[in-house]
A protein has these predicted regions:
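Surface-exposed, interaction-prone regions used to assemble/regulate multi-protein complexes
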Residues: 1-100
Length: 100
């Protein structure tokens, strides 16, 4: 389902960063082409957010799978937005759900 959010204009409606036990979790509620999605990222590390104003608009996400490269659990996936690089981080796991 991440393909539905790649290289498309996305509006970030809500951004929630939460510490659970010894890990960070990031939850985004986004809108793309009049469809709302909830994206949850677990065991987030190296989180960078630059000059982001709400409601923010980005041009899609790129998700790079590093599992086959032998990277550590905290960096199984690398996520960043296209073009502006306003959001960049690594995570162990993610979940995307459509919310209509």
């Amino acid at each position: 389902m991440i393909a539905a959010l790649q290289r498309k204009k996305i509006r970030i409606l809500e951004l929630l960063l939460k510490q659970t036990e010894d890990q960070l979790a990031l939850r985004l509620q986004v809108s793309c082409e009049n469809i709302t999605y909830e994206i949850c990222f677990f065991n987030v590390s190296c989180l960078h957010i630059w000059q982001l104003s709400m409601p923010a608009e980005i041009h899609g996400f790129e998700l790079i799978d590093h599992r086959k490269d032998g990277w550590g659990r905290h960096a199984f996936y690398e996520i960043h937005d296209f073009e502006e690089d306003l959001i960049h981080f690594y995570c162990e796991e993610y979940r995307i759900e459509r919310r209509d």
